[in-house]
Every structure is written in C-alpha cells, then in structure tokens.
C-alpha cells in the first residue's frame, strides 16, 4: 500500500486539505480498520497527523525520487 495519497475531496476541511495535493499517510492499522487515514495535513501542528475518512483520498504510487523528496520535506 502506498505511503502517499492524493486529496480528492476537501469539502469539510478546505483550510486543512488542498484538493489535488499529495499527502503523506502515516501507518495506523486501527484507523484503517474504520476506513480512516492518518494524514499530515496543512496545519502540521500535530506531528502524529489527523484522522480523515479514507474516501477523501486516493492512493498514489510515486517514483522513488519523489517519495524521498516528500519525506525529506516532512523531516
């Protein structure tokens, strides 16, 4: 499963999520069991991310160089 997702619906969270933007999805088995994703959003005040419905995102497979760049930007 991809570590990155793209926002396809930000209707309820336009300040926290940008439509069409790629976000890092943090591992959270319990959240995913409830169809939720733990996401590092635009707020970035919560290092553990926030929970959002998985229906707001689509998984994205990125080239390795792009993944490295995005992970480095989060560090």
Q: What positions do the PLM features span?
A:
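Basic/aromatic-rich interaction segments and small domains that mediate binding to polyanionic partners
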Residues: 4-6, 10-56
């Amino acid at each position: 499963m991809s570590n990155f997702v793209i926002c396809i619906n930000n209707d309820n969270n336009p300040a926290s999520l940008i439509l069409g933007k790629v976000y890092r999805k943090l591992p959270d088995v319990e959240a995913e069991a409830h169809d939720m994703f733990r996401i590092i959003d635009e707020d970035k005040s919560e290092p553990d991310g926030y929970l959002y419905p998985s229906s707001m995102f689509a998984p994205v497979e990125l080239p390795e160089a792009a993944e490295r760049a995005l992970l480095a930007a989060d560090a």
